[in-house]
Structures are given as structure tokens and as C-alpha cells.
Amino acid sequence: MSLQSTDPIADLLTRIRNAIMAGKNEVRAPHSKMKLTVAQQLKKSGYLSDVKVEKGTPRDTIVITIHEIGTNTTINEITRLSKPGRRVYAAATDIPRIKSGRGIVLVSTSQGVMTDNEARKAKLGGELICKVY
């Protein structure tokens, strides 16, 4: 029996961060549509090797495979920007650039979760979920 997290996205990011620091290449997290979308965007951006959903009796699980430590696509920092107690929103023109464009910001827009570059191209603002580089 697991405790319910007040911020499931922060929990997912912490699981990924802890796995990287521990030298693990696989992370398991309880399934939700938002967590799956965030993980898929990180995979699409090249920060994760694979994202799968494992069907389970009590609950489905997201299985995330992380790149080998030392590759240039390794996550150096992954930080939650918008939190339940302090939501952070930005217009398309105000979305921050991370490490001069080498990192990404995930943005939750009306068209779904996308990277900062995709949001700027689509001229969509939204809630800033996290920054990764």
C-alpha cells in the first residue's frame, strides 16, 4: 500500500532523479495519464531511452528506462517549476530558455504537454511543469 502523493509529477521527477544518482537504469512509477505524457515528452526529447506501461492487477505501472550514465543525453538536472501551492504560468513569449536552449521546459498547454520550443512555435502558453538539462 503506497501513500498518495500531493504532487504526482514531482514524485515522478524525484524517482527519475534518485535513479540517476543511484546509478539505476530503470524506474517504476504508478500510472497516470499526465505522468505518462511527461515521460513520453522526455523520451521524445532524448532524455530517456524508453517508456512503457506495464498492466497490473491493482494498478498499472510506468516503466522508464534511463540512458547510460555518462552519455551526452544524461539528465544533469530535473526540477519541478509549477507546484500545487504555487502554480507558474507563462505566455508563449515568456517561456524561459534553459541553459541557452540546451535544456527544455515542459509546458502544459490547451493542446497537451509539449516542450518549450513546440509551445513557442505554436504560440501557446501554459503551466510550466519542469525544466530539464
Predicted regions and their residues:
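Core subunits and conserved enzymes of cellular information-processing
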Residues: M1-Y133
